[in-house]
Swiss-Prot record:
SUPFAM superfamilies: Release factor (SSF75620). Methylated by PrmC. Methylation increases the termination efficiency of RF2. InterPro entries: PCRF, Pep_chain_release_fac_I, Pep_chain_release_fac_I_sf, PrfB. This is Peptide chain release factor 2. It comes from Xanthomonas euvesicatoria pv. vesicatoria (strain 85-10). Peptide chain release factor 2 directs the termination of translation in response to the peptide chain termination codons UGA and UAA. Signal peptide: none annotated. Its main location: cytoplasm.
Length: 374
């Protein structure tokens, strides 16, 4: 018969971790909210407002992951304790080994719940807008911007998230000057917010006949899609609206009539554009959502800058700082914040970003997170 004291200690340790998470997640309040949302969704009138019904459905799904997840693990650990006692009384080694296998499963669940702690920010559960802006450097920089756009689209798709290209401005020879993509998925903004910053590419340029090494920069900005429950005060007098004909990359997904809309928020010089809707009205509505998201994120970063003097020294709060180097001719991609380094560069550019993003999230949590919305 194997030694059972370490198994019993493991049950106790896992139980303590789950009880700690129960407090961190405010389990009782979430359970009560889950019951409220479930009752609302059972009402025959709920689908009179389809948008609200869908939002409630998403909220229920996220609440269930926490509430049911914690309840199931606590129940399973109690059963494991009973089963271990039975194994001890009957000297049944097979049963004891089955308990160990169960504990491996529960530990994986606990680790997932602990990772979820990183998504405690007010807007972390929101969908996200990702803005990609090519830096100086002409065609090489614009090609780099398109490579990054593809990388994020592939990563989002690998997670089963929905993507929608809201605006794209084609490059003069190749690539793109800028693009905005909406990403809809569970904790999309929570996952993507660590990607804000400047991404640096070093490679032998395919656009250089002498095959020289070039350095290019692209800025990535991520903002949460703001729902109607969040107050964002936008004065219509502060807006300049331009209508234009869609152009550049985008193919069949971009409307070619003169219905594209560009809105400038004059006080902050924040510009958003949308060209994928079927009408000028639809594009304007989408652009206003994008503007609200951007202004929210800028306000969060402004507050962080005021809170932390180091943040205030950044050259451009809106775009953050250089976060990752992609040195392709040396097969090396390195995150400058976490030290994570990969040599399988094509796999990363094909959307294998989990290791980088998870490390950034964990580093942010360990540091207590400088974000005020966290």
């Amino acid at each position: 018969m194997i030694e059972t004291n370490p198994i019993r200690q493991r049950i106790t340790d896992l139980n303590d971790r789950v009880l700690s998470l129960r407090g961190i997640f405010d389990y009782d309040a979430k359970k009560e909210r889950l019951e409220e949302v479930s009752r609302e969704l059972e009402s025959p009138d709920v689908w009179n407002d389809a948008e609200r019904a869908q939002a409630l459905g998403r909220e229920r799904s996220m609440l269930e992951k926490t509430v049911i997840g914690i309840a199931d693990v606590l129940s399973g650990l109690a059963d494991a304790g009973d089963l271990l006692e039975l194994a001890e009384s009957e000297q049944d080694e097979d049963t004891a080994l089955a308990v160990i296998a169960d504990l491996d499963n529960y530990q994986a669940h606990v680790e997932k719940l602990e990772f979820q702690r990183m998504f405690s920010g007010q807007m972390d559960s929101a969908n996200a807008f990702v803005d990609i802006q090519a830096g100086a450097g002409g065609t090489e920089a614009q090609d780099w911007a398109e490579i990054l756009l593809r990388m994020y689209l592939r990563w989002a798709e690998s997670r089963g998230w929905k993507t929608e290209l809201m605006e794209v401005s084609g490059g003069e020879v190749a690539g793109i000057k800028s693009a905005t993509v909406r990403i809809e998925g569970e904790y999309a903004y929570g996952w993507l917010k660590t990607e804000i910053g400047v991404h640096r590419l070093v490679r032998k340029s395919p656009f250089d006949s002498d095959n020289r090494r070039h350095t290019s920069f692209t800025s990535v900005f991520v903002s949460p899609e703001v729902d109607d429950n969040i107050e964002i005060d936008i004065n219509p007098a502060d807006l300049r609206t331009d209508v234009y004909r869609s152009s550049g990359a985008g193919g069949q997904h971009v409307n070619k009539t003169e219905s594209a809309v560009r809105i400038t928020h004059i006080p902050t010089n924040t510009v958003v554009a949308c060209q994928t809707g079927r009408s000028q009205h639809q594009n304007r509505d989408n652009a206003m959502k994008m503007l609200a998201a951007k202004l929210y994120e800028l306000e969060v970063q402004k507050r962080n800058a005021e809170k932390d003097a180091l943040e205030a020294t950044k050259s451009d709060i809106g775009w953050g700082s250089q976060i990752r180097n992609y040195v392709l001719d040396q097969s090396r991609i390195k995150d400058l914040r976490t030290g994570i380094e990969r040599s399988d560069t094509q796999k990363v550019l094909d959307g294998d970003l989990d290791e980088f993003v998870e490390a950034s999230l964990k580093a942010g949590l360990a540091a207590g997170s400088k974000r005020l919305d966290a």
